[in-house]
Amino acid sequence: NMAYLCMLHSKIPHGYVKAVHAEKALALPGVYGVYHCLNTTDRKYSHYRANFDMNVADEERVFNNYVRFIGDKIGAVAACDQETAEKAARLVEVEYEELPFSIGFDDTLEGKNCLPGETAIKDEYELEVGEKPEGTNGLIEVCSSMEIPRLHHATMETHVCVADYDSYENMLTIYCPNQSVHGIRTVIAGLLQMPESRVRVVKATMGGSFGAKQEWFLEPVAALVAKELGCPVKLVYSRAEAMTCTVVRGAMRMNARGYYTPDGTLKQIYYDVTLDAGAYIGNAYDYVRALAGKPTRGYRIPYMHYHSRVISSNTPVSGAFRSWSAAEEALVMERQMDAAAEKLHMDRIALRLKNVAHSGDEDKKLHLPLEDIRIDDALSMGREKFEWDKLIAEDR
């Protein structure tokens, strides 16, 4: 007696749902119900919450009447089979009140999409590592910058969830591929006002995640409808839905300013990073701050100043992504090294060998040893195996 769901997603980037007309859908044989932002709970949650005492903002509902991006969840149709659910979903008509929106860094920083009382910058963070120097006399300044676009995980298996509610036992069981059974239980119990002991989450075998299934989008929907209908409910996202309606790696704008001695030794570096969290903040504060801990693990940096900010545009939501900012940090740092090598007229590998961290060095942020990292050995071996010096000589 499984019920199948088809989602109703926002067709506008920013605004309010004023009315949902579901009469045609409900008249279709085999349709069990149309659940949406105007006839279900208005309790809020965070898709990033992993336990009840996490300091994260509860910004979203199971179905949102205040929509913040194209693809935001506004409702779901439950039916006897997937084909009927999809057919009924196409019959639902939604009225919106549209608001100004922003999809890029500049418009968002200017507050184009801000409501009265809101600020464009949602969070700022600063960190200093090492002893601040007197100045930059005798040092050569090198500036580099880059923008990194959103990136989707593209897991083999898209997002899927099955929820089953036993009204006699008041027991809700959720089956889904996920990275935190306790996080899902915490969120669902709070939303449906159930004791956590009455919510059971079964982690299914995952067809890939890479962070995509560390946050909760389908589970609240399936749980709510299963409890309403009192039968098993299945929700499967298409590839298009997974790419636009779950999480992506957030877009970043990163600037680095390094100061070097004439022989190429890095003495100071200043980072300025902007992370676009997309429509909801989620893990953005933690994610951009995690980046601050990465530079001193790869390079010997006597002094680092890190400044970051988080903005929220009307775009797909940023979330966990494999390596949690290490790839972004590597890109901006290696771009900085290439720019420095060009300005100082040095070989790119030679410059790196002069500055990379060595086994046993101290991570200046954590004050812990880096152990057996051997970056210098890897560079030297690569230089030899790829005949780097020969290639450079031929290029000249």
Can you describe what each PLM-predicted range is?
Residues 40-41, 178-181, 205-209, 237-247, ...:
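Acidic, glycine-rich active-site loops and adjacent beta-strand->loop/helix elements
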Residues 49-53, 57, 122-161, 167, ...:
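Glycine-rich loop/linker segments at domain edges
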Residues 37-38, 193-198, 228-233, 262-263, ...:
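C-terminal catalytic domains of large/alpha subunits in multi-subunit enzymes
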